[in-house]
């Protein structure tokens, strides 16, 4: 794979420059910008002479209540990331407009919507800016109806004013912030890093082939610090094209969550070389071509991993309940009324309730997959095939976060249940399935993976390159090996070998065939349940993902 192909995957963060930076920085310095929009005012601030060099420190007041952000470069530098070329005592209007354009790449810190600048000290959208202004201009007494743990994202931000305000305050929004006219050097560098990251993420997800329609703004993850324990509280994004099927492989429910169009004839998948960074684990993937030049690997591997790890870690954090919430739920005394409610469920009711919970989890898995760098550039057929055959496997990995192995408990929606209460079933084969799922999840939990390692592991499981039916195997192989290289680095940095030369990574890879077996057992159990209870209706996405006519072909490869 050459430089241009890595640039296709990782966008403006590739290639890195010789000084450890990224090529995107120099690109952003000289972008031509339109004149300042109406209402934007430039304020001249006093300048100082430092060692004979004039550094004009300018501020910018974008909108009412906005912080005047510093655009001056650090001492000794003539220009910074935002392209602020200083001439005399005045800042170029194009450069000032560029500042706002660069900041707006970063989503609103409160809800994840498109930001419009720095407001009250925090990068936010117009909606959250106005909400915070109103909350400060009048006496308010907001109340939370949901235990003060509501999701605050673009879809849900108006549902709970209390949690929205608390998040604004937690992020540092303040009326006093308006008085401070410029960012510190450390703050500027942090914003620069965020801009580079979001540029790379947008390029990786929007520069896809014509057959993959992807709304980058719509798919920007919320930066919410709260998350419902109940997975169904996290809605999927709906597409206006959800009434279309896709190539016979995906129906309305999956296309709604994937935001894809019906496939046009003779679509060409993106062209990725068969070259890839090799991964020297016990698993030896099928060879599909040559490898990257050794000198190039040595120069590039660290930068690839850095972008990949950051993308996956954020995707994981935004599609899972916070660990703090999970631990808090385990510390609470048991809710007897909820325990009695679940104990009184019939076999059929428990089946449907599990399907409902699993569907909510899979909605988040789909969102996670779309944020894996390069995933949205695969052909649509391969994207859907990987999700259909891998979503149940990822659900098992995610279940490991919701288990207390010492107490033998599981967080099931919004209630903590003893695992033994989940094993009751009429058919011994169903008991074997449930026990197998919990055993696999407990094995992962006992390895004490970090959140970053769990994110990388999910990427490995989903991108397992030998799934039957995939067309773009070289591309999937490439993405898989990038994740493998990053995963190996994380594991070697954080974990000692388990026994002899057996590593944590060896154990994790050895569990993947078990996941596939459990996925098949789930399909067989579903088939038996449908035969015995044909009148029961399952959630549309669940029914579509686990339709026997398609998934069995994929998983039996």
From Swiss-Prot:
Keyword field: DNA-binding, Metal-binding, Nucleus, Receptor, Transcription, Transcription regulation, Zinc, Zinc-finger
Source organism superkingdom: Eukaryota
DNA-binding residues (ranges): 105-180
Zinc finger (NR C4-type): 108-128, 144-168
Bias kind Polar residues: ranges: 21-34, 215-226
Predominant place of localization: nucleus
CDD domains for the chain: NR_DBD_ROR (cd06968)
Induction of its expression: By ecdysteroid.
Any one GO molecular-function label of the UniProt entry: RNA polymerase II cis-regulatory region sequence-specific DNA binding
InterPro entries per record: NHR-like_dom_sf, NR_DBD_ROR, Nucl_hrmn_rcpt_lig-bd, Nuclear_hrmn_rcpt, ThyrH_rcpt, Znf_hrmn_rcpt, Znf_NHR/GATA
Subcellular location: Nucleus
Family: Belongs to the nuclear hormone receptor family. NR1 subfamily.
Protein name: Probable nuclear hormone receptor HR3
Species whose genome carries this gene: Galleria mellonella (Greater wax moth)
């Amino acid at each position: 794979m050459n430089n241009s192909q890595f640039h296709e995957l990782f966008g403006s963060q590739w290639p890195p420059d010789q000084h450890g930076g990224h090529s995107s920085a120099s690109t952003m310095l000289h972008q031509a910008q339109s004149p300042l929009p109406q209402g934007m005012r430039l304020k001249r601030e006093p300048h100082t002479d430092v060692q004979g060099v004039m550094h004009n420190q300018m501020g910018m007041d974008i909108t009412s209540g906005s912080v005047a952000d510093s655009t001056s470069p650090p001492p000794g530098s003539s220009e910074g990331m935002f392209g602020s070329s200083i001439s005399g005592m005045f800042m170029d209007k194009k450069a000032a407009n560029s500042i706002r354009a660069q900041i707006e790449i970063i989503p609103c810190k409160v809800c994840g919507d498109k930001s419009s600048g720095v407001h009250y000290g925090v990068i936010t959208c117009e909606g959250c800016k106005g909400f915070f202004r109103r909350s400060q201009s009048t006496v308010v007494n907001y109340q939370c109806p949901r235990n003060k743990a509501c999701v605050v994202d673009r879809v849900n931000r108006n549902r709970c004013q209390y949690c929205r305000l608390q998040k604004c305050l937690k992020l540092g929004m303040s009326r006093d912030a308006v008085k401070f006219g410029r960012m510190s050097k450390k703050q500027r560098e942090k914003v620069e890093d965020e801009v580079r990251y979001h540029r790379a993420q947008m390029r990786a997800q929007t520069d896809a082939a014509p057959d993959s329609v992807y709304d980058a703004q719509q798919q920007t993850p919320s930066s919410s610090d709260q998350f419902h324990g109940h997975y169904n509280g996290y809605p999927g994004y709906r597409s206006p094209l959800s009434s279309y099927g896709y190539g016979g492989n995906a129906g309305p429910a999956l296309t709604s969550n994937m935001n894809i169009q019906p496939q046009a004839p003779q679509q060409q998948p993106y062209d990725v070389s068969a070259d890839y960074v090799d991964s020297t684990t016990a698993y030896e993937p099928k060879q599909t071509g040559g490898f990257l030049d050794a000198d190039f690997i040595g120069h590039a591997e660290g930068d690839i991993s850095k972008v990949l790890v950051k993308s996956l870690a954020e995707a994981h954090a935004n599609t899972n309940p916070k660990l703090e919430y999970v631990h808090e739920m385990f510390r609470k005394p048991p809710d007897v009324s909820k325990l009695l409610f679940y104990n009184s469920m019939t076999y059929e009711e428990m089946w449907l309730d599990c399907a409902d919970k699993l569907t909510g989890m899979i909605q988040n898995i789909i969102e996670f997959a779309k944020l894996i760098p390069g995933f949205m550039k695969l052909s649509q057929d391969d994207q859907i095939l990987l999700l259909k055959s891998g979503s149940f496997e990822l659900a098992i990995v995610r279940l490991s976060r919701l288990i207390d192995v010492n107490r033998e408990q599981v967080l099931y929606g919004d209630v903590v249940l003893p695992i033994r209460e989940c094993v009751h079933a009429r058919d011994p084969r169903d008991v074997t399935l449930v026990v197998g799922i919990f055993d696999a999840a407990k094995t992962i939990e006992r390895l004490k993976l970090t959140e970053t390692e769990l994110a990388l592991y999910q990427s490995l499981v989903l991108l397992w390159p030998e799934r039957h039916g995939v067309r773009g195997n070289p591309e999937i192989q490439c993405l898989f090996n990038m994740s493998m290289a990053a995963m190996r680095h994380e594991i070697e940095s954080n974990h000692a070998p388990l026994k002899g030369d057996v590593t944590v990574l060896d154990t994790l890879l050895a569990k993947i065939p078990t996941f596939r077996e459990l996925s098949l057992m789930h399909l067989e159990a579903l088939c038996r349940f449908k035969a015995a209870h044909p009148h029961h209706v399952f959630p549309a996405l669940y029914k579509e993902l686990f339709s026997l006519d398609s998934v069995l072909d994929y998983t039996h490869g």
